[in-house]
Amino acid sequence: MKKITVKLISATLLLLMLLTPLTACKKNRPEYVSMTIEGYGEIIIKLDYENAPVTAKNFADLVEKGFYDGLTFHRVIEDFMIQGGDPLGTGQGGSSKKIKGEFALNGHKNNLHHRRGVVSMARSDDYDSASSQFFICNSNSEDVTGLDGYYAAFGIVIEGMDVVDSITEQTSMYAMRGGVIQDTSKRATIEEAKIIEYEK
């Protein structure tokens, strides 16, 4: 009986040792991102590690490096989304790293559905081509909800949808579906993106 008790205690201690680093890791990972948009205001995004852990971490890493500071929303479409994160500003650029696409078509279950306020990764035809470009859905249109399973949603705007709406209203490309804003002076600029602690 004594031997069994000792073994149980040892097993319990081992389990606690294994779980502690995992718990600490979850507590320390960045969960909220603040984006200050020049002339518009602040957007606060809550990252979703449960549905898109690789994508959320990649985004947080880029934010911590200051990657997004000074970049613009180069593609803005009414009743669809605003897209940014391209250092070239052409829709063709990205960071030096590409990540696995965390969406159903690529074999990954992602239960964060595209709807107004959801933040998702842009990509090319290659499922694993997402890098730094992201978009924020600005409506619940069929164009938006139809993205489920095809793109990796990884966060949601919890404050600042009025900012997203203002950007949409003032810089939309009404007749340029799929294009980019050619007049760079009209683009909304990310003044600063940073990791924050957030309390309601």
Regions found by a protein language model. Name each.
Residues 4-26:
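Sec-dependent N-terminal signal peptides of Gram-positive bacterial secreted proteins and lipoproteins
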Residues 18-200:
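Cyclophilin-like peptidyl-prolyl cis-trans isomerases
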